[in-house]
Amino acid sequence: GSSLNASGVAGGSGGGAAIYSSTGGTGNSGGYSPVEGYAGGDGTSGGGGGGGASEVGANSPVHSGGDGGDGVANSITGASVTYAGGGGGGGRTDGGKGGTAGAGGSGGGGAGTNDNSAPVAGTDGLGGGGGASGYYSGSSNGADGGSGVVIISYISTTAKAVGGTITSYTDGGDTYQVHTFTSSAAPHTITANGDVANTRAQQKV
């Protein structure tokens, strides 16, 4: 999100705008196809919701924060998990305005806040956006976004490489090995064991 009277910032998914009719940031800043993220919502007398990986953030209702856009589901780990939801916009309740904070989008988006309560951070490992602060929060800072994740899978009954946290699952008669990296502090390295004949990566996110 953005400070008072400021437009949202562009990114993979756009940031929601601050209050007073400012404009949400554009998404998909890398120009990718398919689209990697959507725009943030516009602000009125509340903040717009942050864009998610599958939809735009909601524009602000009167005095309330817009909801964050939903993320996108992916089954690379063998179970459907939704990633990269947008953070909720901030609302305001001063002077009896009765606004509400925006909800975070599915996929780890954090909720916004009203006034003096703290916004909710995005969920680590899902890459969700952080919620925005309220109008009289005492701070213009929103919550942090959640850390992302790198996942690689390939068909094999045994792991053919080392690196990350290794899990496996079976689907349709095929067994998949899954390498998951959640740390942002270390390089993400996958090293083949040497027995990689006829093995190819099936998916990566």
Model-predicted segments: where are they?
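Low-complexity, glycine/proline-biased repetitive segments and flexible coils/loops
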Residues: 1-205
